[in-house]
């Protein structure tokens, strides 16, 4: 990654070659593309979009980078690790453009388009901690081949696979990657960032594509999205002192309803245990801490120490990630009020109704 960082203007080169890369993609039937030397590795079909994927824009960075590598190598299949290094480098270069702009414009957290991009690293020496951060980012957003300890099943993790945009082939230590038909279609949409804008991350067409073709693949996430939109649509803006509690309840009810149905198969038990039951345990523990805080409310230092002991529940993490991504897609408008609390409204009622049906 350090060597890739030394190479500057890679983002600009992708911009210059984008038309040729797209023309290369148009000639390929990705449904037919396979790496005959290796075995295809599939996404494990986890029915939620992981909270680790805070935004969707890095997926666009991934497919565009992949297209450029295909054009350069004149091959629809490229090395997986090489792709991850290149995609991270492009994401970091974009962050170097976005973050200074956002600081200059004093963008609030709710307005930042750089969320989900890696924090640029400027030191000459790469520390062990930085290497870990870089690898974690690449694994989460661009993909990682994993082996289930219980079943020994090999799967593909990461945002790109969760959205159904890529296919990966692996055997022993050799791993390659290509696009799916869906990944090709998503790549071919024009993107504001790759057109030179730094105050937008996804076009309306790209957002529509993700809403209509990607999110529905993850049934629990799709149900949460529909129920959350319904709640925000019915809430009078400014009338709710803190919408977070209401949104948490909607997320919890959506997940519980899906877990109780017969639609999740083997994942119902895991979602019940790791999301719902775990959230109940943490909430119970947090309430005990709240009681202790009341007992020492005049001791500011002790109050701060106790607050640090409180944990975020899995349901809260799902709510935060879901709302951030919906704001990115333009489905909800995210506003942070004077009290520092998040408020949400629906900018396009027809769009919201079409999703929440």
Q: Where in this protein do the model-derived segments appear?
A:
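Donor-sugar nucleotide-binding helix/loop cap in glycosyltransferases
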Residues: 15-357
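Charged, terminal alpha-helix-loop-beta segments
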Residues: 2-19
